[in-house]
Amino acid sequence: MKLSTSLEMPFRESTDPICSVCNFSSLIAPHFGGLVCSACASFFRRTVALNIHYLCKKDNQCKGMRKNCRACRFESCVKIAGMKRSLVKERKNLNNIPLYILNRRNETGNQGVVRAFVSSNQNRLENRLSLSPLTELPINDEMDVSKILKTTPSSLLKYYVEQVSHGKQFYMNTLNIRTKEELFEIVSYQSKVAAETCRTCPGVDLLDNRDILILRKYFQFSNIWIESTWKYWFSNDFSNDTEKFDIKLMEFIGQVKSTLLISLSRLKFNIFEFTAFKAICIWKLVYHETSRAMKIVAQEHYEGVTKALISYYQTYTLLDSMEIAIRVGEITLLVSSVFQMYHDMAKLYLHMGLPF
C-alpha cells in the first residue's frame, strides 16, 4: 500500500473547483467574505484570531505558497480571495490559545506575534535537537498520571526525547557501514545501550524477564535502524566506499533508504515528532509478541506518548485541530512500513549469523 508522507492530501483527479488561495482542487464555500476551501478558511481564522503576522523571505513573491509560505498564503486570502479580518471573531476561551501566544501577549500587550520564515540551517542535527528546550514540553498534566507507568504523558515523552538527544551514540551511522563486521560491532554496542534503557523505562518493573528481553530487542532495533535513519537524513557524512561490502547488507540498507529514509525526509520530523514515532514503533512491535502484562504496558506507552505529542502541537505550534489529526495520522501510518523492515532485518541477521 502506498503511504502518504506529507501534510498535503494525495493528488487525485477531481471536478471540484480550484481554491483561489492554494490552487488545489477542493470543495469551496463562502468563508469570511471569500470563496475558499475549508483548509484556507481555517488558516485565515487562526491567523487573525491569534493576531499573528508572518514574514516572507522572498518579499511575498513566493509561488505555490500552500503550506510553504504562510505570509504569501495569508496575503492571497486577503488580496485574491477577498477575505476580511473583521469577520473573524476573537477567541475568548484562553484554554484554546497556545501558551507562547499568551506569553507574548503578557509581554507586549496585544501587539501581535511575528512569525519569521525558517532558516535552512535548521535542517542540521544540532538545530533540530534544540528546537525547543526539554523544559518546554507541555507540563500541565499533573492530574493525568498513568497508574500503570506512574508518570504523566509529558514526562513520558521527555524520557524518550532524552534518550535521543543525550543518549550514548556509536561513532558510525548504520546506513554508512559496508561489512558485517561493522554491523556486528554496532549490534554489540547497542545491545548494551538497550539494556541500560530498559532498566529505567517506565512500567518495566511490572514485566517478567522474558518480556524485558523482548523489549530490549526492539529498543536495540530502533536505535540501530530507525534513529540512525533519521540522523542520516540531515547528516553530511555519506560514505561512497563500495570497494568492500556485503551484498545482503547493502541490499537491506538500500531498502531502508528507499522506504523509511524517503518518508522521513518528506515528513521532516523535529525531535519531538521523531521521538514519538520511535517510541510508537517500539511498543507497536512489542504488542504483538508478548504477554498480557506487556500488552497493557505497551498500550499505556502508546496512549501517553500520543497524548503528549498532541499537547505539544496545541501548545507550541500553529497547527489547527485538523492539521494535528493529519500529522498524528501520518506518524502512526508510517509505523506499518517499520513492521516489514523489522522482519527483513531479522532475515538479514539470521543470514549473517547475528544473535536475534
UniProtKB/Swiss-Prot annotation:
Name assigned to this protein: Nuclear hormone receptor family member nhr-169
First and last residues of each zinc finger (NR C4-type): 19-40, 56-72
Keyword Transcription assigned: yes
Keywords noted in UniProt: DNA-binding, Metal-binding, Nucleus, Receptor, Transcription, Transcription regulation, Zinc, Zinc-finger
Assigned protein family: Belongs to the nuclear hormone receptor family.
Coiled coil: none
Compartments, as annotated in UniProt: Nucleus
Function: Orphan nuclear receptor.
Chain residues forming the annotated DNA-binding region: 16-90
Membrane-spanning ranges: none
CC per GO annotation: nucleus
Chief localisation class: nucleus
Taxonomy, superkingdom: Eukaryota
Domain NR LBD per the UniProt entry, residue ranges: 144-356
SMART domains: HOLI, ZnF_C4
Keyword Zinc-finger assigned: yes
One example GO MF annotation: sequence-specific DNA binding
InterPro entries (alphabetical): NHR-like_dom_sf, Nucl_hrmn_rcpt_lig-bd, Znf_hrmn_rcpt, Znf_NHR/GATA
